[in-house]
């Protein structure tokens, strides 16, 4: 009962992993969003403060990084999240089909804010499977090298986020912004 699809979107989860952190905390801390210093956090400046590139600790070594932390980036469409950028645009009331591809070696649960969606089909290891039971969701897991198609509709104008629902991946850049435009 979604109606005709009016727009199609495609996003790709990517990751660029380097060597494990063996004494390279300064390299990790100099990567955007990696120092994890939340001293400037407050309810008023929240996410903007945390993701701001002018953090006073950027480029400094962080002694609280776990020794197993990998350096690299978690991205969507080969881009690290930037609050100043709009990645996708949708229109209120339009039915959309999104193709979400996981081009990485680990699972990434996709989460879309502000609405729900139905999984239409999945493709993994050369097999395409149409969803036999469709229910409204706001998260769907993508296995390594899996593609999932969802159908959704935004009912309210405004800014939304979509991201990997593993907090560490989201914080390391695997997030995008969706601007929903009213009619």
For each predicted feature, which ranges?
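Extracytoplasmic/periplasmic copper-protein system
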Residues: 1-3, 33, 173-183
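Edge beta-strand plus adjacent loop/short-helix module at the start
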Residues: 1-137, 141-149, 166
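Glycine-centered flexibility sites
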Residues: 93, 145, 158, 173-176
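Short loop/turn segments at connectors of secondary-structure elements within structured domains
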Residues: 104-108, 158, 172
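Short, hydrophobic beta-strand segments
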Residues: 150-155
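C-terminal functional regions that serve as terminal interaction/effector modules
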Residues: 156, 166, 170-171
């Amino acid at each position: 009962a979604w109606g005709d699809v009016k727009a199609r979107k495609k996003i790709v989860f990517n990751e660029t992993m380097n060597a494990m952190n063996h004494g390279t905390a300064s390299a990790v801390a100099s990567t955007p969003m990696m120092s994890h210093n939340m001293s400037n956090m407050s309810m008023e400046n929240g996410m903007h403060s945390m993701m701001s590139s002018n953090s006073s600790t950027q480029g400094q070594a962080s002694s609280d990084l776990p020794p197993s932390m990998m350096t690299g980036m978690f991205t969507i469409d080969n881009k690290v999240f930037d609050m100043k950028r709009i990645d996708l645009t949708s229109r209120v009331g339009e039915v959309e089909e999104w193709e979400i591809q996981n081009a990485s070696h680990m699972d990434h649960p996709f989460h879309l804010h502000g609405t729900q969606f139905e999984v239409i089909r999945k493709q993994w290891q050369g097999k395409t499977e149409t969803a036999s039971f469709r229910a409204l969701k706001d998260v769907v897991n993508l296995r390594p090298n899996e593609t999932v198609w969802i159908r959704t509709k935004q009912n309210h104008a405004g800014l939304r986020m979509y991201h990997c629902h593993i907090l560490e991946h989201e914080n390391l850049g695997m997030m995008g912004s969706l601007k929903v435009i009213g009619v």
